Every structure is written in C-alpha cells, then in structure tokens.
Amino acid sequence: MEIKITTLAENTAEMGYLAEWGLSMLVEADGKKVLFDTGMGVAAMHNARLFGIDLSTVDKIVISHGHHDHTGGLREVLQAMRKQVEIIAHPDIWAAKYGRYGKDPEHYAGLPFRRELLEALGAHFNLTAEPVGITDRFLTIGEIPMLTDYEEIDSGLFEKKNGKMLPDELRDDLAMVIDADYGLVVILGCAHRGIINTLKQAQKVTGKELIYAAIGGTHLFSAPKERWQKTAADLKEMGVQYLGASHCTGFRAAAFLAQEFGDRFFTNNSGSRWTLPFK
C-alpha cells in the first residue's frame, strides 16, 4: 500500500511554505484522503494552495484533540471544502481547555469555534471514544490508556469544570493508524498521553506489532531528558523503523532523537511531502 503524507501546517517550514505553531497533515491511503488536524488557522489553507491541493476532494477530517493549534483552521477549511464532511473526534474536543503560558495562568487553549457555526459550514461530527474505521486498514485508534510508568500529561494544561481549573487528562487525544503490508504507520497529533502509550494502542486496535513509522507530534518539548531516554529505548524495543518528529517534540528533544535514530529520524515540517514506503 502506498501512503502519501503532505504536511500543511507545522512550527517550522520548508523553503517557500508558511509555518505556524500547530499541525495539519493530509494523509492519502487505501483510496481515501483524510485531513488530520487543521493547524492554528492560517498555514494549512495557505500551503494547500501552494501545493495545488483542492480541499473539496478530502473525504474526512480527523481531529487529534481539542487544542486551538489543531482546530484553529477548521472554519477556513470547511469554507474551502464547500460540502458536508464527517469530522471524527473524541467528545471532549469541546471541553473548556486552558494552558499556563508564562505569567498567564489561564490562557484559553480550546477549540475556537462554536459547534453550530461549524455545522452550518458543513461539519458532521462523529464524536466517539472508540476507534473509527475509515477503511478496513485505515482507522483512528480511540481513547488511549495510560500504560507506561513514565509518560505523564503536561502539568501546565487544564480543563475548566464548574468554575474550577482541573488538570486536563486529555482523554480526547487520539491518533490514526494505517495497517500497511510493510508495517503500521501511525499519525500523531501531539501524543499528549505519551507516544509509547499511543503506539501500544495502535498495536492493540490493529492486532499487529510491526511499526514502520510514527509521524507527528510527541510532546517531549516540556518533558525531562530522562523521559526522552526512556522513550527512545522503548521505541527501539518496539522496533519502530522510522520516526518523523513534528510540532511539540521541540528542538532539543528532536536533536536527541536524531542522535538515537540516525538516518531513521526525520523532521516533518510545513511543506514536507512523503511517500511511504520510503525508498
């Protein structure tokens, strides 16, 4: 199975493309085109035009979680699509999400649009904590259990409930997996619940062990180096062949992973275009 991945929004960019804090990837596999996240709001549409991509040809949208840097482009994307489209996500994407940024202890970080507005533009939300099959071999992995003893959710992320700021458990965090004949290809949003936990869930959902590639955010930028080391060790033990880091991985963690994985590591930026399997 050939898989094509076009990165439309990411923190850094290839020459001539627009970068912004966030993530958006167009994934083409098994006869379907799926837009995975929409970035902060500007880059995805801008870069899609540069690539000559007609977003009206997209079959479905998958939202990895409810943070604004993954959902901020939804309005513009739906306006460009000009049709009814299924959006697959966890119900908690609508939670009141906040983050602690610098001296601001209550910075709103959630989905920036009302559901009614998005539905008026053609969105049909399929909200579930369970895996969703886009095809038999291309699916979302559902809610991710916290299995490892070292992967923790960022303590600077919160959910407002009944007027109180509580730690956000990020139950809405999800990923996609493609069951290719050369191994699993896992598409990550932020991996807030841990990249190893995420890959284990992808294995469980598919019943397959071999992981060909994991591409996307790993949320290691705020993690201690000890976690980087344990993550790298587990990735090797799991036999992950390629690792494409994006977004919330952070430069220092990405540099560490590049040292650990050598030629099997790559950065996935705005303007990147990949065809799998790699040759």
Question: What is each PLM-predicted segment?
Answer:
Residues 3-51, 169-188:
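Conserved beta-strand hairpin/beta-sheet module of binuclear metal-dependent hydrolase folds
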Residues 6, 88, 124-128, 139-141, ...:
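General small-molecule cofactor/ligand-binding pocket signal
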Residues 10-12, 38-41, 66, 91-93, ...:
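Active-site metal-binding loops of divalent metal-dependent hydrolases
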Residues 43-94, 206-213:
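Active-site metal-binding motif and surrounding structural segment of the metallo-beta-lactamase
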Residues 67-70, 86, 166-270:
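Cap/insert and terminal regions of metallo-dependent hydrolase folds
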Residues 92-121:
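Active-site neighborhood of divalent metal-dependent phosphoester bond hydrolases
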Residues 104-112, 130-182:
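Active-site-proximal loop/helix segment associated with metal-binding centers of metalloenzymes
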Residues 117-125, 179, 238:
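A structural motif corresponding to the C-terminal end of an alpha-helix
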